[in-house]
A protein has these predicted regions:
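Conserved mixed alpha/beta catalytic, RNA-binding, or beta-rich assembly cores of soluble enzyme
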Residues: 62-117
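Extreme N-terminal basic, low-complexity initiation segments
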Residues: 2-8
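Short glycine-rich phosphate-binding loop at a beta-alpha junction
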Residues: 123-130
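Phosphate-centric recognition/catalysis
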Residues: 27-40, 44-64
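Phosphate/ribose-phosphate-bearing ligand recognition and processing surfaces
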Residues: 135-147
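Short acidic-glycine loop/turn motifs at beta-strand connectors
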Residues: 57, 76-80, 180-183
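Divalent-metal-activated hydrolytic enzyme cores
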Residues: 146-191
């Protein structure tokens, strides 16, 4: 189930990160924790907090709330393995510990976690969500945070050769996202 897949992914990410965290530091293994809250039609629901990622090879419905943050959903239709991340910033300051709060870390970690869970890299398909400019004061400023988050996600996916098959990005309103790991379906509602 999701917990067994999560344990395998955590072990893989721990090895890949190659760091022993000091007290208070986030590890790659910590970002795959998930928060189950109910089931719908027998499918477990999970809520994904910012700075985390979720991967499962079994049916699961994952939801999150996005403003300027971005979520990348990846899905392998053959292996039926899917995952979602939720990052806050395009990249972290220099000499910052690796964290899924940053797009430059969260997107590669998500790719690696899906491969560790049985997905084939060449079969992955991406969907990108979020990146709104929700603060009125920044709506006229070129290069707002949401736009930068979207640009980082798209650049990494392009560099990895992963096609973006759907997106709902930018704008001025937040979004509620629901993603199904077993079939790649996604629903978005403006907030």
């Amino acid at each position: 189930g999701p917990r067994a897949a999560g344990a395998a992914v955590r072990a893989f990410l721990r090895r890949r990160a190659g760091v022993r965290p000091e007290r208070g530091q986030q590890t790659a293994a910590a970002v795959v924790d998930w928060f189950p809250y109910a089931t719908t039609g027998g499918v477990p629901n999970a809520y994904l907090h910012a700075g985390h990622l979720f991967v499962a090879g079994t049916p699961c419905r994952v939801s999150t709330i996005l403003g300027s943050c971005v979520s990348v959903a990846l899905f392998d239709p053959v292996a039926q393995v899917g995952g979602l991340n939720h990052f806050l910033l395009p990249q972290g300051p220099e000499n910052t510990a690796p964290s899924a709060r940053f797009g430059t870390i969260a997107v590669p970690w998500l790719i690696d976690a899906l491969v560790a869970a049985g997905a084939q890299r060449r079969a992955l398909q991406a969907k990108v969500f979020g990146g709104a400019c929700v603060l009125r004061a920044f709506r006229t400023t070129a290069g707002n945070l949401g736009t930068k988050n979207v640009q980082v996600a798209k650049a990494i996916l392009q560099a990895e050769g992963i096609p973006i098959v759907a997106e709902d990005v930018d704008g001025e309103r937040g979004r509620k996202l629901i993603f199904q790991t077993h079939d790649g379906a996604a629903w978005v509602r403006s907030l």
